[in-house]
């Protein structure tokens, strides 16, 4: 089933100049990039994107990190795009859970600085795409 997902290359991925490497892996996986933009993330967008984590102990540091520098926001499309990208990204903890061959397993340094975000469900993808690409 063809679906869409939102992917963010987080500030650590942009700062470390890994955009090309990450996009190459996305394209090699067979996912199409239907929208892509380098963006500075404002507080309102960050809060809306991470609303499910509000009230958790790490919420403030999450907002601080995602607004610390530009991100690459992209919409990917393809068969089972959500699961396909999440498999490509690897576990959220790059050191302990992400396996070699994944973006985080090969390139990630620590849990908060784990390079990429990918939508985790069709509902999240729809909400996140509407937030980051309102006209799409």
Swiss-Prot record:
Its EC number is 2.7.4.6. The keyword Kinase applies. Its cofactor is Mg(2+). The active site is at 117 (pros-phosphohistidine intermediate). It is an enzyme of class 2 (transferase). It catalyses: a 2'-deoxyribonucleoside 5'-diphosphate + ATP = a 2'-deoxyribonucleoside 5'-triphosphate + ADP; a ribonucleoside 5'-diphosphate + ATP = a ribonucleoside 5'-triphosphate + ADP. InterPro entries: NDK-like_dom, NDK-like_dom_sf, Nucleoside_diP_kinase, Nucleoside_diP_kinase_AS. SMART domains: NDK. Its main location: cytoplasm. One of its GO terms (cellular component) is cytoplasm. SUPFAM superfamilies: Nucleoside diphosphate kinase, NDK. GO terms for molecular function: ATP binding; metal ion binding; nucleoside diphosphate kinase activity. It is found in: Cytoplasm. ATP binds at residues 10, 58, 86, 92, 104, 114. GO terms for biological process: CTP biosynthetic process; GTP biosynthetic process; UTP biosynthetic process. Keywords: ATP-binding, Cytoplasm, Kinase, Magnesium, Metal-binding, Nucleotide metabolism, Nucleotide-binding, Phosphoprotein, Transferase. The keyword Cell cycle does not apply. It holds the Pfam family NDK. Homotetramer. NCBIfam families: PRK00668.1. Belongs to the NDK family. Major role in the synthesis of nucleoside triphosphates other than ATP. The ATP gamma phosphate is transferred to the NDP beta phosphate via a ping-pong mechanism, using a phosphorylated active-site intermediate. This is Nucleoside diphosphate kinase. It comes from Mycolicibacterium gilvum (strain PYR-GCK).
